[in-house]
Amino acid sequence: MMNLEEIWQQVLKQLQAEMPRASYETWAKDTQALSLEKNVLTVCARNAYARDWLESRMTAIVQNILNGILDHPVSVRFVASENPEVE
C-alpha cells in the first residue's frame, strides 16, 4: 500500500504528462497532499488563487487519476495554505 506522499507523487507525475508545462509548474507542482480520510483527499495549494484555479479546472482530472491509482472512488478537496485549518 502506498503512503499519502507516494500517491500524490503519482498524481503529480500524471498531471505533469497531461498539462502544459507552464500550467503544471504554476499551479500543480507546489501542491501537497495533507490527508486521505473517508475517501476524501485534501490537497494544499500555495494560496487561495491557486486553490480556486485547481478546484475549477483540475478536480475531475485529479479524481480520475486517484481512482486509477487507488482502484476506488476518491473525492479531492483543495485548500489554500494560508487557511488557519491547514496550519
Stretches with model-predicted labels:
Residues M1-E87:
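Intrinsically disordered, low-complexity basic tails and flexible linkers associated
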